[in-house]
């Protein structure tokens, strides 16, 4: 894996999303500097809120960008 890894959480509940994100963080090698979490927002903000709350302290920073359905977990600055 290298660069940016995209993780689509559509259709997952909070537990499944957490498991998927944790697995992506474990698999992220030295070449991965960002995990783009696609959680959506039209169906509600539960996944977005969980991602931002639970992973803010575990990564270098969160990048929320202009798309409210995406949160980037920045592992290291590029």
Q: What is the predicted function of each stretch?
A:
Residues 1-78:
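Long, charged, low-complexity intrinsically disordered regions
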């Amino acid at each position: 894996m290298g660069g940016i890894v995209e993780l689509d959480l559509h259709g997952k509940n909070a537990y499944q999303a957490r498991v998927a994100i944790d697995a992506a963080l474990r698999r992220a090698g030295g070449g991965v500097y960002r995990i783009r979490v696609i959680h959506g927002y039209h169906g509600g903000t539960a996944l977005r809120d969980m991602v931002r709350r639970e992973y803010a302290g575990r990564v270098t920073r969160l990048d929320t960008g202009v798309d409210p359905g995406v949160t980037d977990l920045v592992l290291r600055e590029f």
